[in-house]
UniProtKB/Swiss-Prot annotation:
One of its GO terms (cellular component) is nucleolus. InterPro entries: Rrt14. Residues 195-212 have a biased composition (Acidic residues). Residues 26-49, 152-212 are annotated as: Disordered. Belongs to the RRT14 family. It comes from Zygosaccharomyces rouxii (strain ATCC 2623 / CBS 732 / NBRC 1130 / NCYC 568 / NRRL Y-229). This is Regulator of rDNA transcription 14. The keyword Flavoprotein does not apply. Residues 157-166 have a biased composition (Basic residues). Pfam families: RRT14 (PF17075). It is found in: Nucleus, Nucleolus. Its main location: nucleus. Involved in ribosome biogenesis, probably through modulation of rDNA transcription.
Length: 212
């Protein structure tokens, strides 16, 4: 304690001596010390201010990221809702087309519509950002449509073949009936004995024309 008091006295004595010999030197030293302290305080205040501004900027960035994320979620939900409505509509249309197919009433226009549905879903799968469950649902829908389209095409071709066969058989029956009227008692498939080659050729041409 005594040493500290002695040091203070010594400092005061030095300051007093300097004040007598160099007026203003002590005041300048004290001013410099105050300025140094003020600068230190100013630096700390600036540092705190910079940190606060940085924190505000980070918070604003977080808010912006949150807004973008929420916007993506809303957009994705709307897309899911729209896709769900479209799929329900398509399934309803496919049920009608399937009923027409079973009844043999599927038209060319309906077949084209099925093909269009396949193409639309293929393009949609490329353009949408789908998760695994959505991709699986879309693939199942495409498979269902393709099965209906293939089945419808087979039915249409089968109906066309049956119609051609029926027309051919009707024409054949007409020719046989004509021959029976002209040549009573003739065995089916045989020409009469006294028929000339020219007449036989004429009959064959007539039969070919009726087939066509």
């Amino acid at each position: 304690m005594s040493s500290n008091v002695s040091q203070l006295h010594a400092n005061d004595a030095v300051k007093g001596l300097l004040a007598k010999m160099l007026p203003g030197a002590v005041q300048s030293a004290e001013n410099s010390a105050q300025k140094t302290k003020q600068k230190q305080k100013g630096s700390k205040a600036q540092l705190i201010d910079r940190n606060l501004k940085r924190r505000v900027q980070l918070q604003e960035l977080d808010v912006e990221k949150l807004k973008k994320k929420q916007s993506r979620i809303r957009r994705r939900d709307l897309q899911k809702q729209r896709r769900g409505q479209e799929e329900i509509k398509q399934l309803a249309e496919l049920e009608v087309l399937e009923r027409h197919r079973k009844e043999g009433k599927l038209t060319k226009k309906e077949t084209k519509h099925l093909n269009r549905l396949v193409n639309v879903n293929a393009e949609r799968a490329k353009s949408w950002e789908l998760d695994e469950d959505e991709k699986e649902d879309l693939l199942e829908l495409q498979k269902y449509i393709l099965e209906k389209t293939t089945s419808a095409n087979r039915v249409a071709k089968s109906q066309k073949r049956r119609q051609k066969k029926k027309t051919f058989n009707d024409n054949k029956k007409g020719v046989s009936a004509s021959m029976a009227r002209r040549y009573p008692g003739l065995t089916p498939g045989l020409a009469p004995v006294d028929m000339s080659d020219e007449e036989e050729s004429s009959e064959e041409e007539e039969e070919v024309e009726m087939k066509e």
